[in-house]
Structures are given as C-alpha cells and as structure tokens.
Design a protein with these regions (language model features):
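Intrinsic-disorder/low-complexity, polar/charged segments enriched in Ser/Thr/Lys/Arg/Asp/Glu/Gln
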Residues: 35, 153-155, 205
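Catalytic core of Fe(II)/2-oxoglutarate
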Residues: 162-232
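A residue-level signal for beta-strand positions that form part of recognition/binding surfaces
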Residues: 37, 128, 203
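Structured loops at beta-to-helix junctions and adjacent beta-edge loops in soluble globular domains
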Residues: 43, 68, 78-81, 134, ...
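Catalytic core of non-heme Fe(II) oxygenases with the double-stranded beta-helix
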Residues: 114-185
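Non-heme Fe(II)/2-oxoglutarate
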Residues: 1-120
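A short, structural micro-pattern
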Residues: 70, 125, 152, 200-202
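Intrinsically disordered, low-complexity peptide-like regions
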Residues: 15, 23, 80, 141-143, ...
Length: 232
C-alpha cells in the first residue's frame, strides 16, 4: 500500500457518526448539515446486481483515470461528451459543454442501468454519469474534488458492488458504509477522501452528477423517505 494512503487510513478509518434531528428539513440536509454522505435508502431495492453485470461485461472497455493520484482506477461514461468524459471544467466553457451532453454507446449496452437513470433517478437533468472501476489492490490517494466554498451533498455514488476490504474514507469523518449488494449515497466531495480496494475483486461504482430541474418534488420524496428510514 502507498505510504501516504496507509497513514491517511490509520488516522481516518472509523465508523461515520451521523445524528439525525427529529424534524426533516431538506435544505438543511443537503446544504447545511455538514454531513459527508447520506444514504438514499429509499432506493435500496433497485436492480443493482443486474447493473453490476452490465458494467462488468464492459470491463475491458474502461479508460485509465487520473493516474497522477491513483493506481488501478478506470472509468467508462454512460452520459457525457463521449465514453471517456473527464471533468466538464476541462473542456472550456462549462455551460456549452453541458449543452452537448448525451447518452454514449455505453448506455445502449446497459439497458437496466439506463432505465434506472431515466425512470427512477429523481432528477430532470443528467450531467456526467460514469462507471468507476477500482482494480484489486488499487487505490485513490487523498484528494478533494470541490472547494470548501462548495460544501454540500451534491453527487450520488452508487456501489454496484463493494467487496469486503474496499474502503471509501473521508478525512475527519470516517468510512462510508457502502453495501456490497448495492447502495446509493449522496456525497459531499468538498471533503478530502481516499479509496482503497484491499480485495481480490474489481470494485465497480456508478457516479451521477445531476441537476434537479423540475423534479424537486420527486427528489424531496426520496430524500424524506430515506431520512426517516436512516433515522430509524
């Protein structure tokens, strides 16, 4: 294991502690809670394993991703500019790039996944949507995808599988409790985080960047049901 990652995990690999207030406030949850993640438990019964099989079947098509601070990290884009879409900020005018986003051939090969994204996912607009594969022994060094000024739950990370030994760890917060059977979490990626696959299987997740548009009500219902399920 990389020395930097080993030290990071020693300092931060613990159970995340989240306390749910009695009253649900969607704006507070997303914008003000300071939570590093939030499980969308109302989506727990989706066909994650079928989606995993679709992604796994394309494993040899994935592109190497961010070699500068990772090892064994690869991606494949379902919705974007092409099947190897990077951060939209790297293409110039972000607004113009967003206008060009569309389904790639990958989505055509993954009908169950595409159906989830079009019929179930509670947002009107999809930005970049990618499968992310981390090979056995692979890792992603501690990094921050957004600035501190953009602190909010803004991206969805779905574990299509999460073999025992795989860890996604937020600095100062702890380990995200992803489920190997599939689970969806809203994430605040302004927090420093790192990932390590200490297993003998590829770890495949799906990352959804999105805009709610006119589906605020749908998102509200998913958030509220998840909140009270998580709270118990």
């Amino acid at each position: 294991m990389n020395d930097e990652l080993e030290q990071y995990l020693l300092e931060n690999d613990k159970q995340i502690d989240i306390t749910y207030p009695e009253q649900f406030d969607p704006k507070w949850v997303v914008m003000e809670s300071g939570w590093p993640c939030f499980r969308l438990s109302s989506l727990d019964n989706q066909p994650w394993k079928e989606m995993y099989k679709e992604a796994e079947a394309l494993a040899d098509k994935f592109y190497v991703h961010r070699e500068t601070y990772g090892k064994g990290w690869r991606s494949l884009t379902l919705h974007g500019l092409n099947e190897d879409t990077q951060s939209l900020d790297s293409y110039g005018d972000r607004k113009e790039s967003i206008k060009q986003l569309d389904w790639t051939w990958v989505a055509d090969e993954c009908p169950v996944t595409k159906k989830f994204l079009t019929d179930v996912w509670p947002a009107e607009f999809l930005n970049r949507v990618r499968f992310m594969l981390l090979e056995p022994g692979g890792y992603i060094l501690p990094h921050q995808d957004r600035s501190d000024e953009e602190k909010r739950l803004s991206v969805c990370n779905i574990s299509l599988n999460n073999p025992e030994g795989c860890k996604f760890v937020f600095k100062d917060h702890g380990r995200v409790p992803f489920d190997d059977n599939g689970s969806a979490f809203l994430m605040d990626i302004s927090n420093v985080h790192a990932v390590y696959n200490n297993s003998d299987k590829p770890r495949i997740h799906m990352i959804i960047h999105y805009e709610l548009g006119r589906r605020i009500r749908d998102f509200f219902y998913v958030l509220r049901e998840s909140y009270y399920t998580n709270r118990g």
